């Protein structure tokens, strides 16, 4: 099967970062927008080239009058491509008010809950989302503004456990060209243009300033992200070397080097907890022997040259 340049680029990225193999069963998150419809068409072709299996999951957020039409649109697209389709309807606005969280946070939580629920039901092993280079840039800027360490600066990751992002190597302009050249239909989401969301403020107010300074700013950030992804792999190796994990606790060996702080933050992630900031991490490292700190639902006890982290 002949691949277009856009598809070849994604195929190379998948191989470089070992995102998929022929034994994988992959659930695609498809909303119907141009980015996820590109993902659908590219993965449909690559499934034949690489031999993996795909299905589609679509969450109807009930956030727009056209939401039911969007669901029907994606269902029809999957039918044409002979790809299994699974959907669920939720009321994001009601969930947002009831749980006192932002609409964006609520939507993401419900979306991934549905993805994992479907993943388990189908006995699949990976989820693929349509995040692209523009999303990567925006996430990196957002994290810098909020405050982050090197480990978190990488923004979005090509593969992390079940979640994969095979389109991080292409930007929005390339996606627009791909859907235009191939006459791929898609739906437009008005919330993508709402300046009520911090990420869209970055997209429509801050990004143009970067473009004036360096028209190829996204490629610069992508190169930086790749360096950080390599760094993250080294941090993970250090964590494996220095940690002993049991059912409800984790022992970390400290070696008085830069990686101590990084492996402490990974320990929090292992327990599904938000990691402490750099200042709080430094306080943990400097605790006296026998000292105890409780942070984000975890208890941390300082031993002579190690930390015991417990739920």
UniProtKB/Swiss-Prot annotation:
Annotated positions binding ATP: 31-36
GO BP: any one term: tRNA modification
Residues spanning the signal sequence: none
Highest taxon of source: Bacteria
GO molecular function: ATP binding; tRNA(Ile)-lysidine synthase activity
Summary of the function given for this chain in its UniProt record: Ligates lysine onto the cytidine present at position 34 of the AUA codon-specific tRNA(Ile) that contains the anticodon CAU, in an ATP-dependent manner. Cytidine is converted to lysidine, thus changing the amino acid specificity of the tRNA from methionine to isoleucine.
Name the UniProt record assigns to this protein: tRNA(Ile)-lysidine synthase
Species lineage: Bacteria, Thermotogati, Thermotogota, Thermotogae, Petrotogales
Gene assigned in the entry: tilS
């Amino acid at each position: 099967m002949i691949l277009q340049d856009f598809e070849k680029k994604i195929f190379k990225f998948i191989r470089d970062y070992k995102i998929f193999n022929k034994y994988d069963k992959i659930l695609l998150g498809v909303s119907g927008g141009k980015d996820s419809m590109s993902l659908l068409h590219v993965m449909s072709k690559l499934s034949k080239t690489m031999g993996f299996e795909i299905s589609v999951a679509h969450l109807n957020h009930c956030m727009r009058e056209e939401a039911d039409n969007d669901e029907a649109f994606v269902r029809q697209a999957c039918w044409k491509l002979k790809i299994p389709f699974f959907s669920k309807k939720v009321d994001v606005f009601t969930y947002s008010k009831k749980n006192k969280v932002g609409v964006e946070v609520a939507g993401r939580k419900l979306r991934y809950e549905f993805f994992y629920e479907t993943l388990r039901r189908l006995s699949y092993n990976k989820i693929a989302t349509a995040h692209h280079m523009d999303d990567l840039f925006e996430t990196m800027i957002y994290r810098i503004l909020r405050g982050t360490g090197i480990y978190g600066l990488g923004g979005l990751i090509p593969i992390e456990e079940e979640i994969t992002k095979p389109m991080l190597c292409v930007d929005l302009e390339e996606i627009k060209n791909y859907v235009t050249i191939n006459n791929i239909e898609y739906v437009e989401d008005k919330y993508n243009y709402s300046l009520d969301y911090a990420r869209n403020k970055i997209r429509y107010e801050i990004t143009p300033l970067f473009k004036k300074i360096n028209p190829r700013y996204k490629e610069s950030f992508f190169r930086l992200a790749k360096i950080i992804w390599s760094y993250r792999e080294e941090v993970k190796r250090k964590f494996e070397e220095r940690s002993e994990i049991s059912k409800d606790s984790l022992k970390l060996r400290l070696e008085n080097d830069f990686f101590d702080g990084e492996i402490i933050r990974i320990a929090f992630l292992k327990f599904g907890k938000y990691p402490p900031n750099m200042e709080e991490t430094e306080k943990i490292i400097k605790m006296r022997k026998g000292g105890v700190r409780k942070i984000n639902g975890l208890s941390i006890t300082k031993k002579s040259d190690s930390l015991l982290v417990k739920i």
